Amino acid sequence: MKKNIHPQYNVISASCSCGNVIHVRSTLKHNINLDVCDACHPFYTGTQRIIDTRGRVNLFNKRFNKNNKNPFI
């Protein structure tokens, strides 16, 4: 078997925007920043949030509302 062909595993810190820090082993040589983690992700916390990007949720609800008389407007 060949020697020294596998990358070196380093212990890095993955810092979340909520403040949670996770220490993981990786082939990266620097720490990384995360947007969400298991401590703040809505799926794991049981809370749901709707992030409205430029009114797109309202536009979707307006177009596909079942009570709307003309669904093509």
Swiss-Prot record:
GO BP terms in the entry = translation
Database matches in NCBIfam families = L31, PRK00019.1
Molecular function (GO) terms for this protein are: metal ion binding; rRNA binding; structural constituent of ribosome
GO cellular component terms, alphabetically, are: ribonucleoprotein complex; ribosome
**Keyword presence, Ribonucleoprotein:** yes
Looking up InterPro entries in the UniProt record yields: Ribosomal_bL28/bL31-like_sf, Ribosomal_bL31, Ribosomal_bL31_A, Ribosomal_bL31_sf
The UniProt annotation places Zn(2+) binding at C16, C18, C37, C40
Q: What's noted on cofactor binding? A: Binds 1 zinc ion per subunit.
Q: Which UniProt keywords apply?
A: Metal-binding, Ribonucleoprotein, Ribosomal protein, RNA-binding, rRNA-binding, Zinc
Q: What is this protein called?
A: Large ribosomal subunit protein bL31
Q: How does it assemble?
A: Part of the 50S ribosomal subunit.
Name the PROSITE patterns on file.
RIBOSOMAL_L31
**Does the entry feature the keyword Ribosomal protein, yes or no?**
yes
Briefly state the protein's biological role: Binds the 23S rRNA.
UniProt cofactor(s): Zn(2+)
Into which family does the record put it?
Belongs to the bacterial ribosomal protein bL31 family. Type A subfamily.
